[in-house]
Amino acid sequence: MYQKTGQPVSPSYEKIYFSMWELGQRYGRFTKFRVMGESHDQRMIPVLEIGEGEETVFCISGIRGTEAVLPGLLVKLSEEYCKAYECGWPIEEFYEVKELLDNIRICMIPLLNPDGYEVCQNGWTSLRNPIYRQMLRMQGISEKEFQGNGRGIDIKKNFPTLFYTRTRIGREPGSENETKALIHLLQDYRSRGLLSFSEKQKKAIHYCHTSGIIRNKRSCRLARHLHKYSVSSGEICKKEKEEGSLEQFYAERIKEPSLEIEIPVTEEKENGYRDLRLLPLEYIFSLDV
């Protein structure tokens, strides 16, 4: 996943989409590919379910446009899980993938914000809608620092959490196509947790605080457990109630553990991918322990 220069390789949106579709075709016996919805610039958002469990754990990345590495790594992770499931191989000689995912399946969403991802990779010309393209150009934001979606909205702060404050007309909670599609998906499934992956220089696991002492203790326990079994060093902390965040929305509405996991993705942080591949399996393994 890295070039000789040490710079991470970021696959195109099309490569991510068709890789997920291909996995759904190749491993159709135990996977299900679907399109969750469309972005504002009419890019389809791919989802791949792996396993035959009745309940689900969500693994999500690519919420902000600047997160250029994790979407490709989640595609790689999906392929690794599918191969291990089909062949009956354990991962790290411990995690029996088929057994775990037939108990609780994983729903992979590697790229929630394809428009922002494409802008950061290929510039404003990647936006097909001329109105959006011109509007965002006029804001004077660097393409490489652009975090929003095709309308310039930060999806990470667009979910209808408690005490959400609308700051501008048209920026009410849940206003964006990507947000609406994910909300519908989260509410359609019986799920047991949300693992939201983001890119940082140092690893950290944040758990969301919500109503109910028992729920909070359970979320804290799971976060501490995952931290204990991680490879790279980092910290664990309670996530401050963040207005409009996906993680806070899930904790409030679905009332299951909601974790934001910050993964180091630079080349010298090679343990980052190992954490990424083990944490979903360890989470499922630990749910009923």
Question: Where would I find each of the regions flagged by the language model?
Answer:
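Short glycine/proline-enriched loop/turn "hinge" motifs that connect secondary-structure elements
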Residues: 50-51, 145-148, 249-255
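Active-site/substrate-binding loop(s) of hydrolase catalytic cores
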Residues: 54, 68-71, 76-216
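Active-site histidine-acidic residue metal-binding/catalytic motifs
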Residues: 61-66
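Short beta-strand-to-loop junctions in surface cap/lid or active-site-entrance loops
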Residues: 46-55
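Short, solvent-exposed loop/turn elements at beta->coil junctions and helix N-caps
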Residues: 34-38
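Conserved beta-strand elements of the Class I
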Residues: 56-59, 259
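C-terminal accessory segments enriched in acidic
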Residues: 1-19, 23, 27-33, 84, ...
